[in-house]
Design a protein with these regions (language model features):
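Glycine/charged-rich beta-loop-alpha catalytic/anionic-binding loops adjacent to active sites
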Residues: 9-19, 55-63, 247-258, 298-308, ...
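Conserved phosphate/anionic-ligand binding catalytic regions in large, soluble enzymes, centered on
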Residues: 19-35, 254-271, 312-316
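Hydrophobic alpha-helical bundle architecture
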Residues: 36-39, 65, 276-289, 299-365, ...
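Acidic-glycine-rich active-site phosphate/pyrophosphate-binding loop
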Residues: 1-11, 43-56, 232-251, 283-301, ...
């Protein structure tokens, strides 16, 4: 593999596999609020919030961690104001005290706050203005969760950069990602170059999945799967991924390592691979290489889909998980390509109606599609070009899914948001 491409792939993993405390959209709102307060330089007396429709959708129903069970945009704003420390970015709420939780609740009940939909037309946009007396602080995040594009104190610009419409977090060229090159990279990568980010993903995501399986979180999809369908590796792979989401969507304070800006996607793409690696008793190095495959396949698919969409992000991550497990079984580019095509043909079209408890069930469905796609490939079965969205060549099919999500589901997204906010 060319050194330039090799280096870019390493960098992509480092850019995307970030730790985050809680569902990433409300955490991004909290982060923006903390940045705005830092610019103001004093405790705010009122807040004005303008966010894109997809932020409204993804923050409305999910529990903001470390808030004592509070939900919604207002709760996320108050959490960020009280927490401060914007330098922590997506881990901004990791050291909240009980006293601060009480302060958040009081602030939510008493702070004058307006929340409106942004008129900028961005898919991902968070604007927060905090005011005290005659002074104000302003912060805007656009495109992705930590992309602060503007900070102001009154009318004085502290920080400003041009917003790129594609909203990508990368400094790399994502067009370099292909299934064939991803598998080649997984085969040749010096594990030391990716070990830190992948081991953190294993540690964090496994811990929250175990918490989801043992604690009382949400609809307990992970537990339900285990009770109903037993201890097979197939079922455990689904259940552990779902259990992580059970905990995360319902306020668990454990961090996860995200993928493509999403903790649910980070867990979906990694936990099934870890379960199978343990079952197959493969070496740690082999597990890490399989996680390279699963993570990069998910990132590759999400690049065309976009960060936020009406298309459920877990579907891509389930494909990534199936690809990573195929790698564990000795599959390489040819076999993995068929797994991906099979999986997306099964489950594409599942909608995203925001972050909430039922995401865990969608994750289980996404992992099931990945595993069924794998079993089809192992049995010599496949879907062919012309079968719906499937087109000959895995890259063509991935492109079609991106087009469906980004273009075809725009009106679907609007309708979902209208239903959720009426």
């Amino acid at each position: 593999m060319e050194q330039k491409i090799y280096n870019e792939y390493v960098e992509i993993l480092k850019e995307e596999l970030l730790p985050a405390m809680g569902c990433t959209e409300p955490i991004a709102v909290a982060y923006a609020a903390a940045v705005a307060v830092q610019a103001l330089g004093e405790k705010p007396e009122s807040v004005e919030v303008n966010v894109s429709a997809n932020i409204i959708k993804n923050v409305k129903s999910v529990v903001v961690p470390c808030t004592g069970g509070l939900r919604g945009i207002g709760a996320a704003v108050c959490a960020g104001i009280v927490a401060g420390c914007p330098e922590k970015e997506l881990e901004i709420l990791e050291e909240i005290t009980e006293e601060q939780k009480v302060e958040m609740k009081e602030m939510l009940d008493t702070m004058p706050m307006t929340i409106q939909e942004s008129d900028k037309g961005y898919i991902f946009d968070i604007q927060i203005k905090v005011c005290a007396g005659e002074h104000s602080g302003y912060a805007e995040i656009a495109g992705f969760h930590t992309n602060v594009i503007c900070v102001k104190k009154d009318d004085a610009i502290i920080h400003e950069k041009e917003y790129e419409e594609q909203g990508s977090s990368c400094v790399t060229d994502r067009s370099l990602l292909t299934v064939e090159k991803i598998v080649e990279f997984a085969d040749c990568v010096d594990v030391a170059d990716v070990e830190e980010v992948l081991q953190r993903q294993i540690d964090y995501n496994w811990a929250i999945a175990e918490e989801g399986m043992t604690g009382k979180w949400g609809a307990a999809i992970g537990k339900t799967l285990m009770e109903a369908y037993g201890n097979s590796v197939h079922n455990r792979a689904k259940a552990m991924a779902a259990a992580g989401s059970d905990a995360r969507m319902n306020g668990c304070e454990l961090p996860v390592v995200i993928n493509s800006g999403s903790g649910n996607q980070g867990m979906t793409t990694s936990l099934p691979v870890i379960v199978y690696a343990k079952e197959l008793n493969v070496s740690r190095e082999m597990m890490l290489r399989a996680l390279v495959v699963s993570n990069l396949i998910t990132i590759h698919m999400k690049t065309g889909i976009g960060r936020l969409s009406a298309y459920c992000g877990a579907i891509s991550a389930g494909c990534g998980a199936g690809a990573g497990i195929c790698y564990l079984y000795g599959g390489r580019a040819y076999e993995i390509s068929h797994v991906i095509v099979n999986a997306v043909a099964i489950n594409s079209g599942v909608v995203c109606d925001g972050a909430k408890a039922s995401c865990a069930a969608k994750i289980a469905s996404a992992v099931e599609a990945g595993l069924l796609g794998l079993q089809m490939q192992k049995n010599g079965k496949q879907f062919y070009g012309g079968d719906g969205l499937v087109e000959k060549g895995v890259e063509n099919t991935i492109r079609n899914i991106g087009e469906l999500a980004k273009k075809g589901m725009r009106e679907t997204d609007k309708t979902i948001i209208q239903i959720m906010t009426r």
